[in-house]
Amino acid sequence: MAKQNKIGIFTYMLNNYGAVLQSFALQHYLQTNGAADVEIVNFETIRHQQLNKIFRKYSDNFLVQLCFIMLTLLRYKQLKQRKIKTLLFKRKYMKFTRVYTSQTDLFSNLPEKDVYVSGSDQVFNPNGLNRDVYYL
């Protein structure tokens, strides 16, 4: 890989260990194999923000939502610690572009890169969010 390459990574980033470590590993691999600048494209819509909340709407069904809230309360401390740890890790070890909050925002202000990479198992989830962004 030529040293002048600027690479943008499109990935489905949630505050869980798997998503963060997968993104970090890809970014680190590209950096240590010759890329001059590697950034994760920080695409975070309102729906992404909702999914990253500890308490969120899980279902329209009242009983299902109530069960979700109760289970979340039982695991609140663990979920809060995980969220803090992943945010601190991302700040310390990972490089991101500015935040893009919509497809329109992203497509009209696409970060200038030589190469774009799409990664993460969730990028190819047929039920995933904003698939057009990740399918390059």
Stretches with model-predicted labels:
Residues M1-K6:
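Extreme N-terminus of proteins, especially the signal/transit-peptide cleavage junction
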Residues I7-Y17, L21-Q22, L26-L136:
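Aromatic- and Gly/Pro-rich donor/ligand-binding loops
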